């Protein structure tokens, strides 16, 4: 089946899509000086996600981890602690899941341009841009929330993607694991798929004639 919609560029989210590994609050707790009890690990995890949106919008590493530490009743982390925290948090972005890599490879082989549209702190974005996988598979725009100061599902970040793509919305496809982010893309006439797993998305792409 041919791609009757003439898709030219496919944008992917990263976390929860290409990279399934999640941050490890147990490791964060250890670095900032808490024990590995369930209570402490849960406290750190809640603090991390309470400030994540602001971090994704461009908050500095120090500001973010100071906010997390403060929520845990701790003083500002040292420069060394911040470095370790950032490394622990961002290191998972060095590689994508193997099945996701095969999907990107197949799409590139089929002639599609691939881009990224993701909520992500600046340090993580740097890791992605310098990664082997991004240099190998991503030949379209890479839109990071921290670079534009806007997070999904705000329509502004999708407009940034449209401007960078230099294509009409009907030439694009967006894939994300969050239904509200998929809906936000569709409101701007960008076709979008909800990522449940790589096999399901492959089937969706086959139905669209893309694979």
Spell out what each predicted region is.
Residues 26-27, 50, 63, 67, ...:
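Alpha-helical elements of Rossmann-like donor-binding domains used by nucleotide-donor carbohydrate transfer enzymes
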Residues 80, 84-114, 155:
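Short, acidic loop-to-helix structural element flanking the phosphoryl-transfer center
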Residues 25-28, 48, 65-69, 86-90, ...:
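Hydrophobic alpha-helical core bundles mediating ligand binding, dimerization, or RNAP-core interactions
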Residues 15-18, 51, 88-92, 121-122, ...:
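Short histidine/acidic/glycine/proline-rich micro-motifs that form metal-
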Residues 52-85:
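A metal-dependent, Asp-based hydrolase signature
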Residues 1-12, 117, 121-122, 126-211:
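Asp-based, Mg2+/Mn2+-dependent phosphohydrolase catalytic module
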Residues 33-46, 73-86, 169, 210-211:
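Short, surface-exposed acidic
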Residues 2-46, 187:
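Active-site neighborhood of HAD-like aspartate-dependent phosphohydrolases
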């Amino acid at each position: 089946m041919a791609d009757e919609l003439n898709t030219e560029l496919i944008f992917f989210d990263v976390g929860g899509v290409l990279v399934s590994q999640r941050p490890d609050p147990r490791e964060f707790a250890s670095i900032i000086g808490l024990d590995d009890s369930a209570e402490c690990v849960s406290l750190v995890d809640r603090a991390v996600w309470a400030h994540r949106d602001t971090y994704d919008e461009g908050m500095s590493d120090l500001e973010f981890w100071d906010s997390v530490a403060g929520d845990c009743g701790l003083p500002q982390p040292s420069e060394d602690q911040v470095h370790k925290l950032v490394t622990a948090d961002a290191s998972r972005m060095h590689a994508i899941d193997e099945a996701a890599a095969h999907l990107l490879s197949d799409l590139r082989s089929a002639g599609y341009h691939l881009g990224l549209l993701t909520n992500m702190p600046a340090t993580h974005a740097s890791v992605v841009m310098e990664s082997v996988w991004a240099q190998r598979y991503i030949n379209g725009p890479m839109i990071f929330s921290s670079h534009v100061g806007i997070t999904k599902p705000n329509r502004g970040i999708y407009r940034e993607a449209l401007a960078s793509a230099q294509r009409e919305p009907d030439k694009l496809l967006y894939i994300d694991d969050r239904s509200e982010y998929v809906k936000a893309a569709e409101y701007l006439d960008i076709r979008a798929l909800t990522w449940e797993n790589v096999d399901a998305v492959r089937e969706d792409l086959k139905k669209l004639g893309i694979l």
